[in-house]
């Protein structure tokens, strides 16, 4: 994400917060500018990515912009204004530095986000007082290996990695193995390997189960597999998953990590997925259980269909 710049007052602050916004949404910059202004008034410095420094400074007259540089590693928390995609982008910076993230949802579902735009006062107060807890979540590490055994690409996934066919005309022929033992050879459109955090994202749309984020597990979901056994598999977090694109008849595939980083994978190559040594750190400002978040985000009908039908009947007869 490049060099970070600090928004500071006349004296150097003793505390720092990183702020990341959706790259193109003006309302995200407005919300971030309001937050940064509040932080500056409390002698807390804020940092923004290079590509966001200029548009942010235009919304913050009277607050000088200067290089943060060596202070970036002192950041207490990353505050993200946007949807889950923006949070996944911010994770590329926060994960290797072990800095927790707080998401402010300006998108649609926003499962990774902790707050809404209307919660700004609560956000400011709790960041200032460090009144939050931190969850450590499983992250995946993936490596692409050539037939010769040479590693040629690696990345990480907070939500999921998806192996997908590159061309519509043919299915992928993939052998899936767990802990170096073959499990299933699928002719399919692709295969997902997901974290519990990602189980409410692509894997959910593909028919996978919802997993509570404090569960340590790996989830494998075949995509449109032409097979009698094409069920999602939940595995140990210590498992090793190998996906071998068969050299006979398959074409190249594309491996995506969180829909952001990609690599072309050729027939005869292997994708290996293991637990990443780093954990994603998510800051929580409220003790809201995941069950409540699930019901709220997906608008699950917990009142029951009969209650809704009876209410509709009363409205018609009144």
Swiss-Prot record:
Pfam families: NAD_kinase, NAD_kinase_C. Its EC number is 2.7.1.23. The keyword Ligase does not apply. The active site is at residue 84. Keywords: ATP-binding, Cytoplasm, Kinase, NAD, NADP, Nucleotide-binding, Transferase. It is found in: Cytoplasm. One of its GO terms (biological process) is NADP biosynthetic process. The keyword Cytoplasm applies. Its cofactor is a divalent metal cation. SUPFAM superfamilies: NAD kinase/diacylglycerol kinase-like (SSF111331). GO terms for molecular function: ATP binding; metal ion binding; NAD binding; NAD+ kinase activity. Gene3D superfamilies: Probable inorganic polyphosphate/atp-NAD kinase, domain 1, Probable inorganic polyphosphate/atp-NAD kinase, domain 2. It comes from the Bacteria. It catalyses: NAD(+) + ATP = ADP + NADP(+) + H(+). InterPro entries: ATP-NAD_kinase_N (IPR017438), ATP-NAD_kinase_PpnK-typ_C (IPR017437), NAD/diacylglycerol_kinase_sf (IPR016064), NADK (IPR002504). GO terms for cellular component: cytoplasm. Involved in the regulation of the intracellular balance of NAD and NADP, and is a key enzyme in the biosynthesis of NADP. Catalyzes specifically the phosphorylation on 2'-hydroxyl of the adenosine moiety of NAD to yield NADP. Belongs to the NAD kinase family. This is NAD kinase. The gene is nadK.
